[in-house]
A protein has these predicted regions:
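Short coil-to-beta-strand transition motifs
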Residues: 71-81, 348-359
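Acidic, small/polar-enriched beta strand-loop surface segments
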Residues: 1-18, 120-127, 191-357, 365-370, ...
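Generic structural motif
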Residues: 6-10, 20-27, 63-65, 159-174, ...
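Short regulatory "switch" loops immediately downstream of catalytic or recognition motifs
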Residues: 49, 65-69, 84-91, 142-145, ...
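Beta-strand-rich assembly/attachment modules of structural machines
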Residues: 1-128, 366, 371, 377-385
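Charged- and aromatic-enriched interaction segments used to assemble
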Residues: 71-74, 91-247
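Short linear interaction motifs
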Residues: 26, 83, 177, 185, ...
Length: 415
């Protein structure tokens, strides 16, 4: 049994909000499934104001939401920029007026959607192309700096590579796939970067501070092999909201990959067994892959992991103030991120054998003064990693080459 009461810290334009009281908070991040690139994070925040203090917030002001963890240390839940502000009289009397200040903010990916890139892209790996394209917006150019800026007033601890960085986070460079060159581009930076990420079998994301990152095709498997799963118990989740789901819409048994600068070349792969069971469920994925061999590898990869349906976990809910959640699990949940590997045990035995292993795709925080709820959306591990089938293991493999401490649940990621 552990005691936990969340304490929140809200900053607007770098200044901590001190007078108003948090009334309600909803934060949504990530995506609903593995098939699309994520949209911008969304924050809906309500403050209660009783002193008629001046409200100096402005559109595009930076906003961050933090909460204390089990050790009392503040950790980030959200970072973004204000898009809407409203002030409403909630109650009034002769002596007291109570107001609701509602702030809506979006994450940094929204900035990519409203910025246009015109120009060319030279052939390069996926991570390098994405790093280039988003840096056009999120790094200030030399002539964009204030003319009154002087060297002795600049932060002396800033590294040159991150100077004037307005939102670029961790980008996996160079990436795993060589992409073709593109000429005469004219579109939103978000749509261009999303296409590049899909071409590289990766995804864009926002971290908890609002920085934009890119995870390449091997990011999840590398993280899992180095850090393992976050182990959580279904006993700590809210039972009525725990759900697993298997859908025919998740099956892909005939894959066509379009590749090249204009997507005019194609390769295909299909699974006769899956087609015999479920009928032909075809999908065409347009990429800018440069090499035919990479396109064929991707077609085979999609087929390996999606020819047969797997249970996903579209919702599981945790109340972080619950004394049943220990401090280790609570802190892990507070650090949730897109691609976090989770092993959820102690589920009902008729739900996927009582255990689910997956990656977090999206999440929603719902908060009030003394309450903090987290809803997770998870995809099965098999949709992100190429799990070996027994017959696919090399014939020359011997038992004494496998780590004696390897657990069966982790064997799917060991070649």
């Amino acid at each position: 049994m552990t005691s936990y009461t969340p304490t929140y810290r809200i900053k607007v334009a770098g200044q901590t909000v001190t007078g108003a009281t948090l009334s309600g908070l909803t934060i949504t991040s990530g995506r609903n499934d593995i098939y699309t690139q994520p949209s911008a994070g969304y924050c809906n925040l309500t403050l209660i104001e009783t002193a008629l203090s001046s409200v100096d917030y402005e559109i595009n002001d930076a906003v961050s939401i933090e909460v204390t963890n089990s050790s009392g240390v503040y950790v980030y839940l959200f970072g973004g920029f204000i898009t809407d502000i409203s002030i409403t009289v909630a109650t009034s009397s002769t002596n007291v007026i109570t107001q609701r200040i509602n702030i809506i903010a979006t994450g940094a990916l929204a900035r990519l959607a409203r910025a246009i890139y015109t120009g060319n892209l030279s052939s390069d790996f996926d991570g390098d192309q994405i790093d280039f394209i988003i840096s056009q917006l999120l790094f200030d150019k030399w002539n964009e700096l204030s003319s009154s800026l002087t060297w002795n007033t600049y932060d002396a601890t800033t590294q040159w590579q991150n100077a004037e960085n307005n939102g670029v986070g961790e980008i996996d460079t160079p990436g795993d796939y060589q992409l073709d060159s593109q000429n005469n581009l004219n579109g939103s930076i978000y749509s261009i970067a999303s296409q590049l990420a899909t071409s590289g079998l990766g995804y864009l994301y926002e971290d908890s501070q609002g920085l934009i990152g890119y995870a390449d095709s091997t990011h999840r498997s590398e993280y899992l092999s180095q850090n393992g799963y976050v182990d959580l118990s279904g006993n700590d989740a809210i039972g009525p909201n725990l759900q697993i789901q298997k859908k025919s819409g998740d099956v892909r048994n005939s894959i066509t990959i379009a590749y090249g600068s204009a997507g005019n070349s194609t390769v295909s792969s299909s699974d006769a067994t899956s087609i015999g069971l479920y009928g032909s469920l075809a999908s065409t994925i347009t990429t800018t892959l440069k090499n035919q061999s990479d396109a064929q590898d991707q077609a085979d990869y999609y087929l390996d992991i999606r020819a047969f349906p797997q249970y996903a976990l579209p919702r599981v809910t945790f109340q972080l103030q619950s004394p049943e959640i220990d401090n280790t699990d609570r802190n892990a949940l507070l650090g949730v991120f897109m691609g976090m590997p989770v092993n959820l045990s102690n589920m009902p035995s008729n739900m996927n054998g009582g255990e689910f292993q997956g990656f977090v795709e999206g999440w929603t925080w719902t908060a009030s003064m003394n309450r903090l709820q987290l809803d997770l959306i998870m995809s099965p591990v098999a949709y992100s990693l190429q799990a070996f089938r027994w017959t696919s293991v090399p014939a020359a493999e011997t038992w004494n080459t496998i780590s004696p401490t390897l657990e069966w649940l982790n064997a799917t990621i060991v070649a």
